[in-house]
Amino acid sequence: MKKVRLTREGYEKLKKELEDLKRKFMYEISERIKEARELGDLSENSEYEAAKNEQGRVGSRIMEIEQILSNAEIIEDSEENDEITLGKWVVIRNLDTGEEHKFRIVTPQEADFFAQKLSSDSPLGKSLLGRKVGDVVKVKAPSGVQRYQVIAVMNK
């Protein structure tokens, strides 16, 4: 498998998720399966089926995270400059509406809209990589072409 690029923060977040899932997998789900078995006939036992399904889902996620972490390449904060690269915080202004947005450019595995983390593989993320303060980018959106100007680029 090829290397998976992650920021240090993204790597640590996945490690924590893995630890939490293993704990859940080892104790909570196993206990629920045990309790459901004690209820008797497994063929009509919805609690048993639900616990087994969750066990499968959690087990799959554990394997997925282990695969990502074993192939991870950590992206360290790059030097202070105004070029947009992975891990940088960016402030852009929509030139049509005047709205400003701040987010961090991250790998697809770390993208999280609610935490202001934009995937480098998204149309906007792709158009911003390598750009500098003052540059204008055009992004095709469902509502039409949007124009954004880079206002600031920061490491933190």
Curated annotation (Swiss-Prot):
Disulfide bonds: none annotated. It comes from the Bacteria. Signal peptide: none annotated. Residues 1-32 form a coiled coil. InterPro entries: GreA/GreB_C_sf, TF_GreA/GreB_CS, Tscrpt_elong_fac_GreA, Tscrpt_elong_fac_GreA/B, Tscrpt_elong_fac_GreA/B_C, Tscrpt_elong_fac_GreA/B_fam, Tscrpt_elong_fac_GreA/B_N, Tscrpt_elong_fac_GreA/B_N_sf. The keyword Protein biosynthesis does not apply. One of its GO terms (molecular function) is RNA polymerase binding. Necessary for efficient RNA polymerase transcription elongation past template-encoded arresting sites. The arresting sites in DNA have the property of trapping a certain fraction of elongating RNA polymerases that pass through, resulting in locked ternary complexes. Cleavage of the nascent transcript by cleavage factors such as GreA or GreB allows the resumption of elongation from the new 3'terminus. GreA releases sequences of 2 to 3 nucleotides. This is Transcription elongation factor GreA. It comes from Thermotoga sp. (strain RQ2). The lineage of its organism: Bacteria, Thermotogati, Thermotogota, Thermotogae, Thermotogales. The gene is greA.
